[in-house]
């Protein structure tokens, strides 16, 4: 088979199963409204949960820092790219979340890949929730360690997998809030089981940080759990981008030596780090609390109004509200029907989710108003499906 044939066959396979992904060009993609092709839509696809991407205080912080530092960092943090803005943000994050150290990464994908790649060796075992993010599972598959996946949120299955003999170390991997199902992991029980088997716990709280817990400290804080490795990302609740790993002093020093994604990547712009510090200040403030309260009320309003006889609504109380429709083509038709009525929603299909669980992944944000939720419900229940 030629290279071109391989490429063509892969694309054809996606087309015939209605799983071909595409990008949409938008003029505005964050916040309450999405603008595409000159038309304005209510935006139910954004991860900007607290509406901070448009916050004037955060925008101003980025602008001022760009004037001071320029628009790029100029290098890896190991060479010339670790500025006072990066250092300040790391210290603020560590203090906020109660860890000795925080290390910044350019993305959550890079952070997850870096930690697993650097830590896991031959004869080790990774035991991951089967619905863990692609960045975690890909890193686990590529590492020399054995990967075992436990049934989603099934702590008994997790315990059985950890009980089987392992010559090396074991790492349990889960998420705080799951990106496609919107539900939360039983973190306290998972941590208890991990410690009983002398395993470390890695929690990716991309969709919980900033949005849940006291001062927005996330799902782990809310559940009274402190994993050995906590990954937080800044493209959701923070409204910016990037990520950090929270850990001990020794693990941070280890990652600075052996995490190739960190050593060999240009660090985030200092202006971005300063904007993130400004975002953290908003998240921790009374305003941040008010934004979280409003978002929670909107989620409750949506769940109370959904017609359960027409849609399978998962047990999700986060900003992520998936409606399971099953069939790929039906999910695409439903998303298009919503767009025709001015509501922008995204159809999620395999391989992102298991076969037979295609869905509309609706995301609610603090930028929405109650009337927006009511309009979404009206359009959903009137969709010709």
UniProtKB/Swiss-Prot annotation:
Sites of N6-(pyridoxal phosphate)lysine modification: 236
Cofactor(s) of this protein: pyridoxal 5'-phosphate
Entry superkingdom: Bacteria
Enzyme class: transferase
Catalysis: reaction(s): 6-carboxyhexanoyl-[ACP] + L-alanine + H(+) = (8S)-8-amino-7-oxononanoate + holo-[ACP] + CO2
The entry's keywords: Biotin biosynthesis, Pyridoxal phosphate, Transferase
EC assignment: 2.3.1.47
Binding of substrate, residues: 21, 133, 352
Pathway the protein acts in: Cofactor biosynthesis; biotin biosynthesis
InterPro entries: Aminotrans_II_pyridoxalP_BS (IPR001917), Aminotransferase_I/II_large (IPR004839), AON_synthase_class-II (IPR050087), AONS_Archaea/Proteobacteria (IPR004723), AONS_Proteobacteria (IPR022834), PyrdxlP-dep_Trfase (IPR015424), PyrdxlP-dep_Trfase_major (IPR015421), PyrdxlP-dep_Trfase_small (IPR015422)
Binding residue positions for pyridoxal 5'-phosphate: 108-109, 179, 207, 233
One Gene Ontology term from the biological process aspect of the record: biotin biosynthetic process
Family: Belongs to the class-II pyridoxal-phosphate-dependent aminotransferase family. BioF subfamily.
Subunit record text: Homodimer.
Name under which the protein is recorded: 8-amino-7-oxononanoate synthase
Protein species of origin: Salmonella heidelberg (strain SL476)
Gene (UniProt): bioF
